[in-house]
Amino acid sequence: MDSLQLWQRYCDWLYYHPELEIFVDISRIRFTPAQVEALRPLFARAFAEMQALEAGAIANPDEGRQVGHYWLRAPELAPTAEIRQAIQDCVEQVESFAKKIHCGTIPASGGGRFTELLWIGIGGSALGPQFVAEALAPLQPPLNIHFIDNTDPDGFDRVLGRLAGKLGQTLVVVTSKSGNTPEPRNALVEVELAYRKAGIPFSAHAVAITGPGSQLEQQARQEGWLAVFPIFDWVGGRTSETSAVGLLPAALQGIDIRALLAGAATMDKATRVPHLERNPAALLAMAWYIVGEGRGRKDMVVLPYKDRLALFSRYLQQLVMESLGKSHDLQGNRVEQGLTVYGNKGTTDQHAYVQQLRDGLNNFFVTFIEVLQDREPGIPSPFVEPEVTSGDYLDGLLQGTRQALYENGRDSVTITLPRVDARSVGALIALYERAVGLYASLIQVNAYHQPGVEAGKKAASAVLQLQRQVLEVMREQKGSLTLPQLAEKLSCPERIETLYWIVRHLQANGRSLVLVGDPGRPLELSIQPRPA
């Protein structure tokens, strides 16, 4: 296909939303008219299923749940008056609370305004807020945000170290839908301890975002925390950015949450259109399906040419991979579906792995994200060369990479935003939420549950239970044991490798036992009680 034919293909398949000023270009995905026609019946089904989902049908059959994240930015579409009111009340409560924090009506326990925000969450309770904070937070926000999004003790120490001397001005928000997810629970325990050691009342600094009736909600209300915000049963973590999970941190940082919601709502309206060529999310889903042969055979490399959007690929990893990575389809057939996502930002990645993308394995397609506005209005861009700015270089490198990849048989999609603001970020989030939902319908998987995550939690629980048994044995043990002897004593010879991992970790942290011998020869090690 020559350059003029490519230009015509670009014009034929370009989607533009005049209100949002967003472009979607799938012209550099190699597909034929026959492939498009073959997908039309599948899209007819996908549009119908999406319409039923928005009307309140059970769209998560494995858990018997409705799926209602689209209602969050269009409460009038919610199936009941109670849900509509709950959504509206939540947004108003978020705005009111943020205003009281900003103006000092709700002061820090030691007096004065809060200046720091410590956000505790995992998965969608962290990835969305992190992405939006990086993309939209002002240079001097009302509160500086810090994240704990793991159960890494060293990570806790580093974050709390940065807050040394500032805990008295720090607002702590704990986010957990179930209220007993281990990672945020562990962080809560450690942060509470830090407040006790500092002699600061934790409850006067604490906020919960959780499901109604959860263990976390009960604790927050019993201890008199500053506020409790809801996570609705019909909102999943990876689609929670327009719920209190995403709106509260944004509002506290001074981000316009009404604009974020408006951008998402406007994109939702566009992606509700039951016509393939006029629906930008359907165009993305079609591109993914064709390039990966409906089996996710090619990875999606996300390259936003904007520093503010550098965390978008991490956010998309969860949204896409947790939604689409399923072992079985809706009919119970084993399918092992998925779509791998990775990326960082342009032009950095051109000096990292784009070499392989251009000349190595052709097992991917690229999603370029272009932002037309180089800097904030009123800030001039100097010329770095005659008639060329740094932003011109950024744009030229995006175009050059797109062309170089296509010329070597590498496909790509390009999303163009007018600027990075709350409205466009809300629209971008909504675009991909819908694209994932439509693609899930095409391949017939449940996009709204995550059994693999639960399997990992159960396995971890079994490891910790075995560790408790090891500690109990070693407290009573007078002499040394080998690993096989320990396994026999615990009646679990089949778990000897797990035992090795456990005792190695316990020794490294100075707990209850010591290992004598060469750690590289596990069967020769002697396990001894640690001297008192």
Curated annotation (Swiss-Prot):
Superkingdom, taxonomy of origin: Bacteria
EC number: 5.3.1.9
Locations listed in the record: Cytoplasm
Gene: pgi
Active site: E322 (proton donor), H351, K457
Reaction catalysis annotation: alpha-D-glucose 6-phosphate = beta-D-fructose 6-phosphate
Pathway annotation from the record: Carbohydrate biosynthesis; gluconeogenesis; Carbohydrate degradation; glycolysis; D-glyceraldehyde 3-phosphate and glycerone phosphate from D-glucose: step 2/4
InterPro entries linked to this entry: G6P_Isomerase, Phosphoglucose_isomerase_CS, SIS_dom_sf, SIS_PGI_1, SIS_PGI_2
Gene Ontology MF annotations: carbohydrate derivative binding; glucose-6-phosphate isomerase activity; monosaccharide binding
SUPFAM superfamilies from the UniProt entry: SIS domain
A Pfam family hit: PGI
Primary enzyme class: isomerase
Disulfide bonds: none
Protein's UniProt name: Glucose-6-phosphate isomerase
Function: Catalyzes the reversible isomerization of glucose-6-phosphate to fructose-6-phosphate.
Family to which the UniProt record says this protein belongs: Belongs to the GPI family.
GO CC annotations on file: cytosol
Gene Ontology terms describing biological process: gluconeogenesis; glucose 6-phosphate metabolic process; glycolytic process
Keywords for the protein's UniProt record, in alphabetical order: Cytoplasm, Gluconeogenesis, Glycolysis, Isomerase
